[in-house]
């Protein structure tokens, strides 16, 4: 075996307290997940699975941090020395390794653990190594500046100083599969992370109310969960186009019930996906009282439509706690850019409904639209999704959405010769520099001669939370589209 850095991996208490047969299965899954975490990290690695410890040799300098981020790991330490289980050698090597470190600080402690048959005990290690280091510092067993650790096994001993805390929990994949309703905001990714930490594999269901730019932002957030926290699994994002479903809802239900009915439709979509892929539960980011649809009465009305269990890990947490967790998970910065779209926000939403009243509201809904949307959904393999995949398909548009703000990024002369009715003239550099002047409540379609410059500007705008697109093919394609749609020029504009 190559002489690679050695890491001592401690198992989460959630794993070590299991019955022997269950623990063996869980530990086997943890090793599988560790292999996947390290295989994409670069460099060689080797894993040795023992009952009470997992030993990892890995070439990459960031391996300790990567190992600590695998669910089921309590902590990890890089081993400074590996030697025979001989007390004199342990003391001599420990003295040489740590005397300078102890000398640079004021206090130290020696901690020792031992298993197997030896002519000495853990206390002997602590006393003799402590005595050897005592000239360089002061012993403090309560709050030492430096902790020197020794683990003695049957055939070898390990010396290390310090440990990195792991995320704990259960190995991902040992507790079955669920689907998570994801919106891209702060809440649902944190709820997903908490479920992943308990060993639940997840696929994600996104009910899209607002087009490709919104999908791109949600996919970017969800990819963080896939790439950084789903080692050993291959989660997918199921994108369900809810445009026709929402139009039907608006036309056939009272506005004050829109939010609750929408949530029930989303639950139906999530359950349909869950049953199709063999998932056993639905997960959401709802918290009691955070918005009008999340009162107890409304949650009861929403829950009634699901036959699978619905889990809400964030039920009792406030927003500040959720945002702090999102920062730790790594989704906060992306979620902060996501505007959670909702085209059906009434002035006075119902705050306490019932299953009976909401069911009555749904009498005239065409649920075949929902079934069609679920059946026609597209699915993204999040682990295989690349940076290019998250940019190119979402930048271009080949039609002008109703109410969109048009930005013409050509020269004044070209603008005078022809421009889309109502379009604002913005030089390319101005469009990029002055984007903060624009409202994030509008949809923006940018066009230039060939659609290349505006693709870059649309990319910059999407990164900071705008729903912005470049018209595919530039001004020639836009003129053709306008002619087919019989878009009429306003007075003073050239056809």
Regions inferred by a protein language model and the residue ranges of each:
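Rhodanese-like catalytic fold shared by cysteine-dependent sulfurtransferases
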Residues: 412, 416-443, 450-495
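A conserved beta-strand->alpha-helix junction
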Residues: 223-251, 339, 344
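Active-site adenylate/phosphate-handling loop in enzymes that bind or generate adenylated species
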Residues: 128-133, 163-175, 229, 246, ...
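Flexible, polar/low-complexity N-terminal or interdomain linker segments that lie immediately upstream
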Residues: 113-115, 364-417, 489-495
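RNA-binding accessory domains that recognize and position tRNA/RNA substrates
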Residues: 1-179, 189-234, 304, 352-353, ...
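A short alpha-helix-loop-beta-strand transition element characteristic
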Residues: 330-338
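Short, ordered loop/turn segments at secondary-structure junctions
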Residues: 207-210, 242-243, 286-290, 313-316, ...
